[in-house]
């Protein structure tokens, strides 16, 4: 059996393969999660949500927890730094249908870390452990943690944080091989992910710079991780899960055609209309469209046309018109 043709278990939840869609703000909306599942993601993660927003009934935050019956298993990621609030939010997320609760200890964005949340928790390991413990005690579903290798290069805290998370009851850990200070610059450090794998007995999910079959193979081979989590490599590219699966299984890798890309772009757009309404769908689809069309002939001019559309029908006509020219 190769690295891909096997189920993976996180606590009580088993997924059919070790391929996971990372939680990404502005990317992992419900329609895209459904598309990723269809193209081979064994576990999808919703966009991170504020624990305080959930607990205090923020309408927009709760709307982000809308779940479709066909996307399970689903992980919902929470960010926050107050154990009691995180525990209460986890209960809400479970009630909304989360199969796994993920705790964000990796977000590098300033407005998150300035509140001591996200990757700032890596600078306060006792508090991080308390957050995990509180969430584990509050819910009956598995709890996972997503982290980075540390705040900066001055201290490699991930192994110790991983041990503390395991002691607090975490079922698995996802490790992005960069520090907070790196954001997304440089390369993911696979040696540091491997060190976390050796530090704990629970599954470790490798994350960072997986963009195709060979890079996924390197992640498995050089880290010994149990599963992989694909983030930016999946932006506008749900086919990456099929590509990775085929590559690691020794099958011929089939790249999506331009027609395939336009068809899924429209599928995503129609899903956003149903999920969020026409106005929001038009606005949000501009970012998605730039990812779907990246590298295609005439994509820069197409993006300009897309950005000028003001109605659903205009958007459909622009994409449909370009798609016809690819046939």
Task: Give residue ranges: language-model regions.
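Alpha/beta catalytic cores of nucleotide-metabolism and tRNA/nucleoside-modifying enzymes
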Residues: 1-11, 15, 19, 25, ...
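Glycine-rich, positively charged N-terminal anion/phosphate-binding segment
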Residues: 2-9, 24-99
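N-terminal small/glycine-rich loop or linker at the start of catalytic domains
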Residues: 8-20, 54-74, 107, 111-115, ...
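Hydrophobic faces of well-ordered beta-strands that scaffold small-molecule active sites
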Residues: 19-23, 44-46, 74-78, 101, ...
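Active-site beta-loop-alpha junctions enriched in small/polar residues
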Residues: 24, 49-51, 79-81, 106-108, ...
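Alpha/beta enzyme core
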Residues: 38, 87-117, 125-202, 218, ...
């Amino acid at each position: 059996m190769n690295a891909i043709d096997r189920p993976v278990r996180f606590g009580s939840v088993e997924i059919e393969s070790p391929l996971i869609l990372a939680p990404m703000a502005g990317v992992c909306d419900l329609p895209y999660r459904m598309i990723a599942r269809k193209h081979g993601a064994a576990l999808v993660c919703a966009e991170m949500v504020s624990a305080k927003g959930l607990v205090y009934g923020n309408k927009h935050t709760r709307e982000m927890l809308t779940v479709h019956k066909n996307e399970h298993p689903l992980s919902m990621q929470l960010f926050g730094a107050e154990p009691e609030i995180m525990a209460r939010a986890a209960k809400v997320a479970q009630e909304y249908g989360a199969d796994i609760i993920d705790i964000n200890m990796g977000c590098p964005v300033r407005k998150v870390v300035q509140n001591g949340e996200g990757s700032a928790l890596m600078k306060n390991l006792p508090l991080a452990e308390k957050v995990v413990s509180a969430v584990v005690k509050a819910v009956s579903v598995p709890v996972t943690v997503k982290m980075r290798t540390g705040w900066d290069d001055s201290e490699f805290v991930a192994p110790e944080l991983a041990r503390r998370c395991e002691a607090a009851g975490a079922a698995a850990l996802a490790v992005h091989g960069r520090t907070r200070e790196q954001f997304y610059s440089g390369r993911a450090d696979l040696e540091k992910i491997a060190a976390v794998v050796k530090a704990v007995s629970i599954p470790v999910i490798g994350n960072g710079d997986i963009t195709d079959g060979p890079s996924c193979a390197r992640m498995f081979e050089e880290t010994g991780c149990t599963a992989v989590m694909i983030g930016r490599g999946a932006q506008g590219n749900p086919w990456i899960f099929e590509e990775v699966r085929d590559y690691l299984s020794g099958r011929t890798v089939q790249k999506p055609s331009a027609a395939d890309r336009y068809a899924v772009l429209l599928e995503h757009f129609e899903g956003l209309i149903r999920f969020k309404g026409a106005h929001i769908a038009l606005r949000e689809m501009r970012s998605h469209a730039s990812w779907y069309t990246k590298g295609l002939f005439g994509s820069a001019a197409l993006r300009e046309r897309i950005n000028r559309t003001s109605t659903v029908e205009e958007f459909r006509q622009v994409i449909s018109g370009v798609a016809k020219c690819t046939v």
